[in-house]
Amino acid sequence: MSIQVFCDFDGTITNNDNIMSIMEKFAPPEAEEVKNRILSQELSIQEGVSQLFQLIPTNLHDEIIQFLIETAEIRNGFHEFIQFVNENNISFYVISGGMDFFVYPLLQGLIPKEQIYCNETDFSNEYITVNWPHPCDRLCQNHCGLCKSSLIRKLSDTNDFHIVIGDSITDLQAAKQADKVFARDFLITKCEENHISYTPFETFHDVKTELKHLLEVKL
């Protein structure tokens, strides 16, 4: 049995949710209604996120990238956490509902590209189109967009110890099949509603401390 860590990006590795930051800065007012319908689960994540990005003109590409580089902050303790994970030969994957055009640049030099799974974007038309290279498998019918639970099944063994780290509704299905959940913000609410055991965290120092203890117990 090996330990596999599956970590969200927006609002988890970064302090802010980059998709929401983009929408607040660049999207028209109707984005707010779409966002609320995603959070209430009235819209699937795939439907909602597609609709959100269809509100953003592609000619804002460079401006959006510059905005995120200036405003996105990596959560405290993440660098040390990754060092600890690497030193202990723990498998680590970023499974993000975010977009390639900002996830890859913000993680450059921290996480190898082959350990990052995110959505793809097309800027060839007037508005941004989202492509979904990691859809739900036959065991999930939630139209997740990037299906985190399907990726966990694809990347790991059923005998592995699965750790999920996340903050929002997009992490709920993954949390349902995890052996250990680190949660913050809205994911805490969803875990409690679904009776999922979780450990709250604010920084990756918290996660590292708990993971270190877990390794000691398992060894």
Swiss-Prot record:
Question: Which pathway is recorded for this entry?
Answer: Amino-acid biosynthesis; L-methionine biosynthesis via salvage pathway; L-methionine from S-methyl-5-thio-alpha-D-ribose 1-phosphate: step 4/6
- Which Pfam families has this protein been placed in? HAD
Biological process GO annotation list?
Answer: L-methionine salvage from methylthioadenosine
Key words of the record: Amino-acid biosynthesis, Hydrolase, Methionine biosynthesis
Top EC class per UniProt? hydrolase
Whether Hydrolase counts among this entry's keywords is yes
Main role? Dephosphorylates 2-hydroxy-3-keto-5-methylthiopentenyl-1-phosphate (HK-MTPenyl-1-P) yielding 1,2-dihydroxy-3-keto-5-methylthiopentene (DHK-MTPene).
The protein's name: 2-hydroxy-3-keto-5-methylthiopentenyl-1-phosphate phosphatase
Protein's organism: Bacillus anthracis
